From Swiss-Prot:
NCBIfam families: 16S_RimM. The PRC barrel domain binds ribosomal protein uS19. The keyword Chaperone applies. This is Ribosome maturation factor RimM. The lineage of its organism: Bacteria, Pseudomonadati, Pseudomonadota, Alphaproteobacteria, Hyphomicrobiales. GO terms for biological process: ribosomal small subunit biogenesis; rRNA processing. An accessory protein needed during the final step in the assembly of 30S ribosomal subunit, possibly for assembly of the head region. Essential for efficient processing of 16S rRNA. May be needed both before and after RbfA during the maturation of 16S rRNA. It has affinity for free ribosomal 30S subunits but not for 70S ribosomes. Pfam families: PRC_RimM (PF24986), RimM (PF01782). Residues 92-166 form the PRC barrel domain. Gene3D superfamilies: PRC-barrel domain (2.30.30.240), RimM (2.40.30.60).
Length: 177
């Protein structure tokens, strides 16, 4: 497991006074003001002075960023927080996305299907993206108990049920072409 968790990404500048768009990945975006944030290398530290909600993101003022040029230089900077600064998982079905990256993806018989590449939230719930073992296009699955019944972070694997979307099954009387 990684020592630091990706918690937000800095977007484009907002205005001319150094504010930035901020895309938060945690359940409590306002908690960003309490966390010690760093860039990916850990060398640069950030402190959120103010944070307010906007349409599909937040607008933040970061300590030491006073103008648009300084804000622009931070565009697409990922912000990390030390794992020990975050609350512990509330239950056994709660995971940090960072802990799922790189896990083996297996079917219910234990056959290797691929490797977890990413987790996405497109607004209707988390979606798991994995790279198939034999190569090819990545595959997406809803990150639900039905589609992903087993998450074994210490064991380095997840178990998936690939065909869990009944809407993709054609009706029995569908024409065969």
């Amino acid at each position: 497991m990684t020592d630091r968790i990706l918690i937000a990404r800095i977007g484009a500048p907002h205005g001319v006074k150094g504010e930035v768009r901020l895309f938060a990945f945690g359940e409590d975006p306002l908690a960003l003001k309490r966390y010690p944030l760093t860039d990916e290398s850990g060398a640069r530290r950030f402190k959120v002075q103010s944070l307010r909600a906007a349409k599909d993101h937040f607008v933040a003022r970061l300590e030491g960023i006073a103008d648009r040029n300084a804000a622009e230089a931070l565009t697409n900077t990922d912000l990390f927080v030390p794992r020990d600064a975050l609350p512990a998982a509330e239950d056994e079905d709660t995971f940090y996305h960072a802990d799922l990256m790189g896990l083996r993806v297996e079917d219910q018989s234990g056959a290797l299907l691929g490797t977890v590449l990413a987790m996405h939230d497109f607004g209707a719930g988390d979606v798991l993206e994995y790279t198939p073992e034999g190569g090819g296009r990545t595959l997406l699955l809803p990150f639900t108990k039905a589609a992903v019944p087993v998450v074994d972070v210490p064991g380095g694997r997840i178990v998936v049920v690939p065909d869990t979307n009944p809407d993709e099954t054609p009706p029995e009387d569908a024409d065969q072409a």
